[in-house]
């Protein structure tokens, strides 16, 4: 698994509420959270699909030719 995906969820220290996705290593799933807009870490994806591609290996390889 990509080491980025093992980082804890970090909402950041600003007060915005951007819906983002992170990989939860306890549940082994990508889950939604609200990102504050600054700070945080790399376990922070714009879409569920992006999170699953990086952390679960889903994506291009799973698409039909």
Swiss-Prot record:
Residues 5-55 form the BPTI/Kunitz inhibitor domain. Pfam families: Kunitz_BPTI. Gene3D superfamilies: Pancreatic trypsin inhibitor Kunitz domain. One of its GO terms (cellular component) is extracellular space. The keyword Metal-binding does not apply. Negative results: does not inhibit voltage-gated potassium channels Kv1.2/KCNA2, Kv1.3/KCNA3, Kv1.4/KCNA4, Kv1.5/KCNA5, Kv1.6/KCNA6, Kv2.1/KCNB1, Kv3.1/KCNC1, Kv4.2/KCND2, Kv4.3/KCND3, hERG, Shaker, HCN1, HCN2 and voltage-gated sodium channels Nav1.2/SCN2A, Nav1.3/SCN3A, Nav1.4/SCN4A, Nav1.5/SCN5A, Nav1.6/SCN8A, Nav1.7/SCN9A, Nav1.8/SCN10A and the insect channel DmNav1. This is KappaPI-actitoxin-Ael3a. It comes from Anthopleura elegantissima.
